C-alpha cells in the first residue's frame, strides 16, 4: 500500500525515506494534513506491527493504537503484555445505539403483541356483550308480546261488555215494545192514534190488511166499464169477480138441499 505523498515528503526531508515515488500525473486537490491524528514517527520508532498505527485522540489528549485492517483500537501498545483490543468508542456508541433501537423495536413488537392479545381477549367480551344484548332484546320482545296479549285480552273484554250492553239494550227495547203493544192506548204515536180513533170500525182497513180508502173510493169513474165486478175487493178469494145473481144463489141452495135429502 503506497504512503501518502505528504508523508513521503516529510520522511524524505528527515532522511528516513530515500526513494520518492513519482507523483501521479492526474491533478490532485491540495489537502491539509496538519490535523492528521496519526503519529507516523512514533509508529516507526516503536516498531509497531504492520497495519498498526499510533493515533492521537484530540478529545482526551491521549494516544491510542489503531489497526487499520480490523478497525480495532487499544490504549496499550501491541508489544505490551497487558495489550487488549476492542472496538472504538464511536463504534461502540453506534452498536449501542443499534442495540437500543433493536431493543426498542423488540419492545414495540412486544407491546403490539400485547395489544393484539388484549384485543383478542376483548373479542370474547364483545361476544358476551352481544349475547347479553340479544338476551335483553329477547326479553323486551317477550314483554312486548305479553303486553300485546294483555291488550288483546282487554279488547276482547271490552267487546264482550259492548255485546252484553247491546243485548241488554235490545232486551230492554223488546220489553218496552211489548208493554206498548199490551197497552190499550199507545202513548208514543199521538198523531196516528188520533187517526185510528177517527177510523170507522166497519172499514175493512181497520180489521184487515186492506188499504184505507178515501172519500172517492168506490165511486164510479169516468170512462169505466160497468162489469158488475167489485173493484174494491182484494185478495185471492175474490180477485175482483162479479157477485152471482140472487136467482143463481137460490138455485144453488136448492140443488144442495136435494143432494142432502137423497143422501
UniProtKB/Swiss-Prot annotation:
SUPFAM superfamilies according to UniProt: WW domain
Region (5 X 7 AA approximate tandem repeats of D-R-[NS]-H-E-K-S): 104-138
Annotated region (Important for interaction with TXNL4A), positions in chain: 243-253
Record InterPro entries: WW_dom (IPR001202), WW_dom_sf (IPR036020)
Positions with biased composition (Basic and acidic residues): 99-173
Sites of Phosphoserine modification: 245
Origin: domain of life: Eukaryota
Main location: nucleus
Alphabetized SMART domains for the sequence: WW
Role played: Intrinsically disordered protein that acts as a scaffold, and which is involved in different processes, such as pre-mRNA splicing, transcription regulation, innate immunity and neuron development. Interacts with splicing-related factors via the intrinsically disordered region and regulates alternative splicing of target pre-mRNA species. May suppress the ability of POU3F2 to transactivate the DRD1 gene in a POU3F2 dependent manner. Can activate transcription directly or via association with the transcription machinery. May be involved in ATXN1 mutant-induced cell death.
Domain remarks in the Swiss-Prot or TrEMBL record: The WW domain may play a role as a transcriptional activator directly or via association with the transcription machinery. The WW domain mediates interaction with WBP11, ATN1, SF3B1 and the C-terminal domain of the RNA polymerase II large subunit. Except for the WW domain, the protein is intrinsically disordered.
Name by which UniProt lists this protein: Polyglutamine-binding protein 1
Species, as recorded: Rattus norvegicus
Amino acid at each position: 500500500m503506497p504512503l501518502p505523498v505528504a508523508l513521503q515528503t516529510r520522511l524524505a526531508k528527515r532522511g528516513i525515506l530515500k526513494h520518492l515515488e513519482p507523483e501521479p500525473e492526474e491533478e490532485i486537490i491540495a489537502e491539509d494534513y496538519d490535523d492528521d491524528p496519526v503519529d507516523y514517527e512514533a509508529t516507526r520508532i516503536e516498531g509497531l506491527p504492520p497495519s498498526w498505527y499510533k493515533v492521537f485522540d484530540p478529545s482526551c489528549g491521549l494516544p491510542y493504537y489503531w489497526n487499520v485492517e480490523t478497525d480495532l483500537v487499544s490504549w496499550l501498545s501491541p508489544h505490551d503484555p497487558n495489550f487488549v483490543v476492542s472496538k472504538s468508542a464511536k463504534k461502540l456508541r453506534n452498536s449501542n445505539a443499534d442495540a437500543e433501537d433493536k431493543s426498542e423495536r423488540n419492545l414495540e413488537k412486544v407491546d403490539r403483541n400485547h395489544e393484539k392479545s388484549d384485543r383478542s381477549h376483548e373479542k370474547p367480551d364483545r361476544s358476551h356483550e352481544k349475547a347479553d344484548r340479544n338476551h335483553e332484546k329477547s326479553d323486551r320482545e317477550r314483554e312486548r308480546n305479553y303486553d300485546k296479549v294483555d291488550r288483546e285480552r282487554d279488547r276482547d273484554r271490552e267487546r264482550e261488555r259492548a255485546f252484553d250492553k247491546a243485548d241488554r239494550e235490545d232486551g230492554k227495547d223488546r220489553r218496552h215494545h211489548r208493554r206498548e203493544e199490551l197497552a190499550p192506548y199507545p202513548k208514543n204515536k199521538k198523531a196516528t192514534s188520533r187517526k185510528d180513533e177517527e177510523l170507522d170500525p166497519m172499514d175493512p182497513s181497520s180489521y184487515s190488511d186492506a188499504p184505507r180508502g178515501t172519500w172517492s173510493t168506490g165511486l164510479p169513474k169516468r170512462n169505466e166499464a160497468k162489469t158488475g165486478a167489485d173493484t174494491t175487493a182484494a185478495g185471492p178469494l175474490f180477485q175482483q169477480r162479479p157477485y152471482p145473481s140472487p136467482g143463481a144463489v137460490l138455485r144453488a141452495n136448492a140443488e144442495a138441499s136435494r143432494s142432502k135429502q137423497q143422501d
